[in-house]
């Protein structure tokens, strides 16, 4: 009985230590959610506005830009998959990888060869384990991405998109990331990044006429400058959405782990109390039995 009681107490201490770790990780993730949400909210208007401006510029020029031109017979598509660098985030990375797998199958059915770009250590590990070649592998910034991180990935994608397919380039670029909806809801989504889909027109302000823009030095020059910024901003927004989703998923996972640890501690505590009671009962029985034996001998 004494040995069983010691084992339960050892298990309780082990679970209590684990609970401290998961609780700390839960609090850290919760503190990061607010910052990540603020960054997401700040990035969305810029991404939307640059899309609107590019559409306005493109509507006033007849020159077809490489980043907005549909390829007649696309044969190769880049798939950028954004996951986490670390684990303990529930199904966050696995859901993104599952959505990427569905997209890859769809592209193959359309006769397009998928070219994979992994953002986050989980994606890189997943594809390397399965022997899938990677055109790009980026790690180290999944939780707190910077604009320079997005630019590094965007530069590689633009280079691939502007390179002929016979020289290893791609005809399309698709982005798989996790969209942040709320602290309880995050959705793995797939969006086509390039060629950019231009809006038909702007909504007239307050029912008035559409704005008539003047561009210096020219609409074409403005388009050349803005389109790379569009790719960078869209990619940066996706990284921020994913970072917020990762923190939310990790906070939920760690809260669940903490709750499970509390339940396990209660279970072990009850078992230890029973073992202690059984040990006391046994000791009392032995004392009473010994006393009775002495009385009978007397």
UniProtKB/Swiss-Prot annotation:
Pfam families referenced in this protein's UniProt entry, alphabetically: ATP-synt (PF00231)
Could you state one GO cellular component term attached to this entry? plasma membrane
Which keywords has UniProt assigned to this entry? ATP synthesis, Cell membrane, CF(1), Hydrogen ion transport, Ion transport, Membrane, Transport
According to UniProt, the name of this protein is: ATP synthase gamma chain
Membrane disposition: Peripheral membrane protein
The entry assigns this protein to a family as follows: Belongs to the ATPase gamma chain family.
Using the UniProt record, give the first listed, main subcellular location: membrane
Write out the function statement from the record. Produces ATP from ADP in the presence of a proton gradient across the membrane. The gamma chain is believed to be important in regulating ATPase activity and the flow of protons through the CF(0) complex.
Q: Return the SUPFAM superfamilies for the record.
A: ATP synthase (F1-ATPase), gamma subunit (SSF52943)
Record text on subunit structure and interactions:
F-type ATPases have 2 components, CF(1) - the catalytic core - and CF(0) - the membrane proton channel. CF(1) has five subunits: alpha(3), beta(3), gamma(1), delta(1), epsilon(1). CF(0) has three main subunits: a, b and c.
* An individual GO BP term: proton motive force-driven plasma membrane ATP synthesis
Gene3D superfamilies attached to this UniProt entry: 3.40.1380.10, ATP synthase, gamma subunit, helix hairpin domain
User: Which PROSITE patterns does the entry link to?
Assistant: ATPASE_GAMMA
Where does the record say this protein resides? Cell membrane
UniProt GO MF annotations = ATP binding; proton-transporting ATP synthase activity, rotational mechanism
């Amino acid at each position: 009985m004494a040995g069983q009681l010691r084992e339960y107490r050892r298990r309780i201490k082990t679970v209590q230590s684990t609970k401290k770790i998961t609780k700390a990780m839960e609090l850290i993730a919760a503190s990061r959610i607010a910052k990540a949400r603020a960054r997401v909210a700040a990035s969305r208007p810029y991404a939307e506005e640059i899309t609107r401006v590019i559409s306005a510029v493109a509507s006033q020029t007849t020159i077809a830009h490489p980043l907005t031109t549909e390829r007649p017979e696309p044969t190769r598509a880049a798939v950028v998959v954004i996951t986490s660098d670390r684990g303990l985030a529930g199904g966050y990375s696995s859901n993104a990888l599952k959505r990427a797998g569905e997209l890859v199958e769809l592209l193959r059915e359309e006769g397009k060869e998928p070219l994979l770009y992994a953002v986050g250590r989980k994606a890189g590990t997943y594809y390397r384990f399965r022997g899938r070649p990677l055109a790009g592998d980026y790690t180290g910034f999944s939780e707190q991405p910077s604009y320079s991180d997005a630019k590094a990935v965007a530069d590689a994608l633009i280079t691939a998109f502007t390179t002929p397919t016979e020289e290893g380039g791609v005809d399309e670029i698709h982005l798989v990331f996790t969209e942040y909806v709320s602290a309880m809801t995050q959705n793995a989504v797939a969006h086509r990044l390039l060629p950019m889909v231009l809006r038909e027109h702007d909504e007239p302000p307050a029912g008035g006429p559409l704005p008539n823009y003047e561009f210096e030095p020219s609409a074409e020059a403005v388009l050349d400058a803005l389109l790379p910024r569009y790719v960078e901003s869209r990619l940066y927004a996706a990284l921020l959405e994913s970072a917020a989703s990762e923190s939310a998923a990790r906070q939920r996972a760690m809260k669940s782990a903490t709750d499970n640890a509390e339940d396990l501690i209660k279970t072990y505590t009850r078992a230890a109390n029973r073992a202690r009671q059984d040990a006391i009962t046994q000791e009392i029985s032995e004392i009473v039995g010994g006393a009775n034996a002495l009385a009978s001998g007397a």
